[in-house]
Design a protein with these regions (language model features):
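Charged, often Cys/His-bearing segments associated with DNA-binding zinc-finger transcription factors
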Residues: 2-77, 452-486
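Flexible, glycine/threonine-enriched loop-and-boundary segments that flank and lead into catalytic domains
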Residues: 301-320
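Helix-centered, glycine/charged polyanion-binding patches within enzymatic domains
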Residues: 364-438
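Short, conserved catalytic/metal-binding motifs centered on acidic residues
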Residues: 57, 97-99, 113-117, 137-143, ...
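Active-site- or DNA-interface-adjacent structural scaffold in DNA-acting proteins
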Residues: 17, 130-306
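Basic, low-complexity intrinsically disordered segments
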Residues: 30-32, 74, 78-97, 104-170
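Secondary-structure capping and boundary motifs in well-ordered enzyme cores
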Residues: 51, 67, 87-95, 135-138, ...
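Electropositive, glycine- and tryptophan-enriched low-complexity nucleic-acid-binding patches
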Residues: 314-362
Length: 486
């Protein structure tokens, strides 16, 4: 025992602390104990959440059916190890996983999901709280660090456990999960629409800011002429005076080149650490200065060089700027069984093997292997070993049953639409290629959560109808020839 004095008011009380064996050794990441372990069965002044809310609510029912303990065991190896005195314990895994589920299921930002959690007792119950909390669960920036800790494999676990839950409650069976529909779409990045005049002006401002931050005096910053040229280029483009617009763009390139060369000359006198920090932006500015409208692999955003330009043939939006993502859904009920990003804008057929490999990994807990993949003509010319590929280009060899499955191919389109409008897939705010990969997996997990909530609500409504029908004579309420539908 090691003792010390604790001063409480004017009293000095000896306090004894027992150091457990291995106190200073490294151990797996410590997490805060769950609310059920910290609080007694009941309190005098605070009522438990289960006594205040409707336990038949779909979110409450789903919280009882999600395998939280299995999810914690799957995510624990991916969390960093800490020492016994590593500061405050980390937040519970269930709390973070629940917030990530709710964020994408209800189309909210990190800040908004924490604020809504504070107001909603059902959300607090879903994340494992026992009594109503009156402070936010965590700082919104903690969700960013947790996403980085989990990585792509951890986010895949969140998606896989929604599939396991759907199979466990018999919302889908194994035979339905063996047939999947695969399609690709574009996950747009949170950038402004790229125009030459805007990009050149942004690069000039960035170089001036870097020089000022590190105490480098440039000969000229063009603080007045740069914004004026950008506005002038926009007016000329709107008036379709393209010859004048191109003249303004040449002038903007001249100003950017002058500032770039001036900064490069004076950077040689700086410390190596300063040169290393600025060299990244100098390379991007040089790349922007050299590119032309017809070039390939252009730079579309100074802060996001991974952004690519893709054309999907949409009349209202000919070009989209982001990354290609693949979506795999069950052929009959539309449950997402695979979602991943494909940097580099590859041919759709070249993504099929990787997409089905991911789906196979996500379905391994339910002991299902995708056997049939229904695709569009963009996947022609590619085969995957062990999987039957169906598309309408095989018209002469298809059976009538296979044609019926091909007619289900367009069922993936509304799933993609709901992913974009309801689950935040239409705009990715996360940084880099890793952010693109994490975001699409979070959107898919949020969509599956909405799918499960909808299934539970429909089941409850169906049971209410059956109960009402059994308690009411069929001759008075239900005609004999009326089918029971939900």
């Amino acid at each position: 025992l090691q003792g010390f004095i604790c001063v409480i008011g004017v009293l000095e009380l000896p306090v004894f602390v027992t150091l457990r064996p291995g106190f200073w050794q490294f151990s797996p990441m410590r997490t805060r104990r769950s609310a059920t372990e910290q609080l007694p069965a009941d309190e005098l002044f605070r009522s438990r959440l289960e006594n205040q809310i409707d336990l038949r609510h779909p979110l409450v029912q789903l919280s009882h059916r999600l395998p939280w303990s299995a999810l914690e065991q799957a995510l624990s190896p991916r969390l960093p190890a800490t020492t016994g005195t590593g500061g405050r314990p980390a937040l519970p895994v269930r709390l973070i996983a629940g917030l990530l589920y709710l964020k994408h299921a209800y189309d909210l930002s990190d800040e908004a999901v924490c604020e809504r959690w504070l107001e909603n007792p059902y959300w607090q119950f879903f994340t494992g709280e026992v009594v109503f909390q009156t402070c936010v669960p965590c700082d919104p920036s903690s969700l960013t660090r947790w996403r980085q800790r989990l990585g792509e494999a951890g986010m895949e676990e969140l998606l896989a456990h929604t599939i396991n839950t759907a199979h466990a409650i018999k919302a889908v069976d194994a035979r339905e999960l063996s047939r999947v529909i695969v399609d690709t779409t574009v996950q747009e990045k949170a950038i402004a629409h790229p125009t030459d005049s805007r990009l050149l002006e942004v690069a000039r401002k960035k170089l001036v800011l870097l020089a000022k931050r590190h105490g480098i005096a440039l000969r000229q910053t063009y603080a007045r002429q740069g914004p004026a040229l950008r506005r002038k280029a926009g007016r000329y483009a709107h008036a379709r005076q393209f010859k004048r617009m191109r003249k303004v763009l040449r002038r903007q390139r001249t100003l950017l080149g002058r500032g770039l060369r001036d900064l490069q000359r004076k950077l040689a006198q700086q410390e190596p650490s300063v040169r290393e920090r600025i060299s990244v932006w100098l390379e991007r500015a040089q790349r922007l200065l050299a590119q032309r409208p017809k070039d390939k692999q252009k730079l579309y955003a100074l802060h996001a060089p991974e952004v690519e330009c893709m054309s999907k043939g949409k009349a209202r939006q000919p070009y989209e700027f982001g990354v290609k993502v693949g979506i795999a859904v069950s052929a009959r009920k539309g449950l997402i069984v695979g979602a991943r990003s494909f940097p580099g804008n590859p041919y759709d057929g070249d993504t099929l093997a990787e997409q089905l490999e991911q789906a196979r990994g996500l379905l391994q807990d339910v002991d299902v292997i995708p056997q049939v993949a229904i695709v569009d003509l963009g996947y022609r010319g590619r085969d995957v070993e062990g999987v039957q590929i169906l598309h309408r280009g095989q018209a002469k060899t298809l059976t009538r049953r296979q044609w019926r499955w091909i007619k289900r191919r367009q069922a993936v389109e509304p799933v993609i639409g709901h992913l974009k409008q309801d689950c935040r897939l239409n705009r990715c705010h996360l940084k880099g290629t890793q952010g693109d990969a994490l975001h699409v997996l979070g959107c898919a997990a949020g969509y599956n959560l909405r799918w499960l909530l909808r299934w539970i609500a429909c089941l409850r409504a169906w049971l209410q109808v059956v109960r009402a029908r059994s308690s009411t004579p069929s001759s008075t309420m239900w005609p004999a020839n009326m089918a029971l539908e939900v």
